[in-house]
């Protein structure tokens, strides 16, 4: 009973495995024929009917499979070798070895019996299928096989032709994968040939009942000589889902689909990067150095020219000087933006160097640098030409400007001369000198009546550029500080003269006798009367107030006192002359 139990467990394992494969019908196409699985005879025949249109008699294989599965024997694996099997009969205690020998050359009795049985019943499948890179041989006599091919980029194929029982290989590979303790997916059904070369493995499989011809590169990874993958196998912690997810990635690879991350993990990254740096970066650096040297030479020449223009000893007009200042400011802005663009392009170049595979963009950046330097050079040349034109025009019209300035300085009036003589650094207090001069002239012209009317105030405000209130305030202050002291001084002089005349007139009649007036005396009287009449006419002409009280000094004037005015005519003449000299 203990010997029968392993058979039932093994059958349950086979059924579970077949159901699991049926749950994923697209694994053959999704994994791109990269797994080799050898199911039982019935599944193998179905696969051959789908892939190769060859008529196969299924009833014969069903009978042979039934007889083989109903054999009263138990199959056990030899722990010393993974491909050595023992078939133990339940009725006989002896154990017969039905696996390969150590050399893998001669099959055992059961394999011979089954192969003879299959070959006698059906002679359709005669030779294994060899699939290479170029073509598939045109042969209709093909043994039961299952073909697994690589991708177009990996250029490798493996053909497995089976002439023995598929259950032995299936069970041996399944037990071997389960006993190893790690899940390898469907690669666990392949025998492990880690320590053998590809040629030796191919010779061993060709001489055995299971013929395998491996056509692959010799640089395949160690441990998987028949593996159709070029990637590293997944670790023990990674499951089958992770393997399928990594294998099902299709589509073009680019810089935005993880291409840079794949290149970073490659061992060819560093030598390829060095080679690209030698051929691209060095050439681009030479171009950039040449362009920078030429641009710097041009900049130095332009600076020399501009400095020559600006250092000219001839002064410029204010208008031309302003234009030249604006042009020089634009030149500084152009230089600043050129340096900024150059720095930005250098930053872009360094960012391209950090990403593998994008170093080929460096020559294009050098072309952009040359284009930018050419544009900025054109701007600088245009600015330099404008500055040169301004300097030439200023030098031509320099003599005319000097002559005009001299004429203005000579023709200018005294007010302009005084304004030029005042110091610029001294703070200005009060009204401007030109306005004060205009107001003072009007005051002396109207000295006898220094009260301007509204129209006079408006006219003076227009001439001086002051407001009407400023004109009124100035006249108020001028009458108090300037005009009133002058009038008081004149009045004191007149009063002194009158007193002196009175004293002299009172003394003379008492000393002289009453005689008849001589003709000379009459002539003096007529002269005095003439001077009196002329003074009265002058007072009427200037509009002097002839009332009893003066508006400013409140002095009484006797109109009838003609004698005093006649006796003081010589005194008044002296005072009037002094007043005229003061005003003039």
From Swiss-Prot:
Region BELL domain, annotated ranges: 316-387
Comp. bias regions, Acidic residues: 295-305
Keywords assigned by UniProt, alphabetized: DNA-binding, Homeobox, Nucleus, Transcription, Transcription regulation
Pfam family membership, one: POX
GO molecular function, one term: DNA binding
Major localisation: nucleus
Gene Ontology cellular-component terms listed: nucleus
Compartments in which it is found: Nucleus
Domain of life the protein comes from: Eukaryota
GO BP, sorted A to Z: inflorescence development; internode patterning; maintenance of floral meristem identity; maintenance of inflorescence meristem identity; pattern specification process; plant organ formation; secondary shoot formation; vegetative to reproductive phase transition of meristem
Chain intervals for the UniProt region annotation (SR/KY domain): 266-282
SUPFAM superfamilies, per the entry: Homeodomain-like
Region (Disordered): 292-317, 503-529
InterPro entries the record matches: HD (IPR001356), Homeodomain-like_sf (IPR009057), KN_HD (IPR008422), POX_dom (IPR006563), TALE_homeobox (IPR050224)
Regions recorded as binding DNA: 424-486
Domain notes per entry: The SR/KY and BELL domains are responsive for the interaction between the TALE/BELL proteins and the TALE/KNOX proteins.
Function: Required for specifying floral primordia and establishing early internode patterning events during inflorescence development.
The family this protein is said to belong to: Belongs to the TALE/BELL homeobox family.
Self-association state and partner proteins as the record states: May form heterodimeric complex with the TALE/KNOX proteins STM and KNAT1/BP.
Protein name per its UniProtKB record: BEL1-like homeodomain protein 8
Organism field: Arabidopsis thaliana (Mouse-ear cress)
């Amino acid at each position: 009973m203990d010997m029968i139990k392993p058979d039932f467990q093994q059958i349950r394992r086979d059924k579970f495995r077949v159901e699991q494969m049926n749950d994923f019908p697209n694994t053959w196409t999704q994994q791109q024929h990269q797994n080799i699985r050898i199911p039982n005879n019935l599944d193998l025949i179905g696969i051959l009917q789908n892939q190769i249109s060859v008529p196969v008699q299924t009833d014969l294989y069903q009978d042979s499979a039934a007889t083989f599965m109903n054999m009263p024997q138990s199959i056990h694996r030899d722990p010393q070798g993974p491909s050595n099997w023992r078939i133990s009969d339940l009725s006989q205690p002896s154990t017969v070895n039905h696996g390969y020998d150590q050399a893998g050359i001669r099959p055992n009795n059961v394999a011979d019996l089954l192969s003879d049985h299959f070959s006698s019943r059906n002679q359709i499948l005669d030779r294994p299928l060899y699939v290479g890179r170029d073509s598939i041989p045109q042969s209709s006599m093909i043994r039961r096989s299952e073909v697994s091919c690589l991708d177009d980029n990996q250029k490798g194929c493996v053909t497995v032709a089976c002439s023995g029982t598929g259950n032995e290989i299936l069970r041996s590979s399944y037990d071997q994968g389960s006993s190893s303790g790690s899940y390898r997916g469907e690669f666990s059904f392949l025998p492990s040939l880690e320590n053998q070369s590809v040629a030796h493995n191919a010779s061993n499989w060709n001489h055995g009942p299971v013929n395998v011809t491996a056509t692959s590169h010799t640089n395949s990874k160690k441990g998987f000589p028949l593996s159709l993958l070029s990637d590293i196998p997944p670790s023990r912690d990674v499951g089958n889902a992770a393997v399928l997810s990594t294998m099902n990635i299709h589509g073009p690879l680019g810089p935005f689909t993880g291409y840079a991350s794949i290149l970073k993990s490659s061992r060819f990254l560093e030598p390829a990067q060095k080679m690209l740096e030698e051929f691209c970066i060095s050439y681009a650096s030479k171009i950039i150095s040449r362009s920078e040297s030429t641009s710097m030479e041009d900049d130095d020449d332009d600076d020399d020219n501009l400095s020559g223009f600006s250092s000219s000893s001839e002064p410029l007009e204010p208008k031309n000087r302003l234009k030249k200042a604006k042009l020089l400011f634009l030149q500084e802005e152009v230089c600043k933006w050129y340096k900024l663009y150059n720095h930005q392009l250098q930053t872009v170049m360094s960012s391209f160097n950090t990403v593998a595979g994008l170093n080929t963009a460096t020559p294009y950046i050098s072309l952009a640098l040359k284009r930018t330097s050419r544009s900025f050079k054109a701007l600088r040349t245009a600015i330099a030409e404008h500055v040169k034109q301004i300097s030439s025009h200023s030098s031509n019209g320099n003599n005319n400007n000097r002559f005009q300035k001299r004429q203005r300085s000579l023709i200018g009036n005294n007010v302009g001369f005084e304004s030029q003589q005042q110091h610029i650094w001294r703070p200005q207090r009060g009204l401007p000198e030109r306005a004060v001069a205009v107001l003072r002239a009007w005051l002396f012209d109207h000295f006898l009546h220094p009260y301007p009317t509204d129209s006079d105030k408006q006219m003076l405000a227009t001439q001086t550029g002051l407001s009407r209130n400023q004109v009124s305030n100035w006249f108020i202050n001028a009458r108090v500080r300037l005009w009133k002291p002058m009038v008081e001084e004149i009045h004191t002089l007149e009063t002194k003269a009158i007193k002196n005349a009175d004293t002299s007139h009172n003394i003379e009649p008492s000393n002289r006798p009453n005689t008849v007036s001589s003709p000379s005396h009459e002539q003096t009287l007529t002269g005095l009367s003439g001077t009196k009449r002329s003074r009265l006419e002058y007072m009427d002409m200037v509009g002097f107030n002839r009332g009893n009280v003066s508006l400013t000094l409140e002095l009484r004037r006797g109109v009838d006192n003609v004698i005093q005015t006649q006796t003081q005519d010589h005194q008044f003449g002296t005072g009037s002359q002094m007043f005229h000299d003061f005003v003039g």
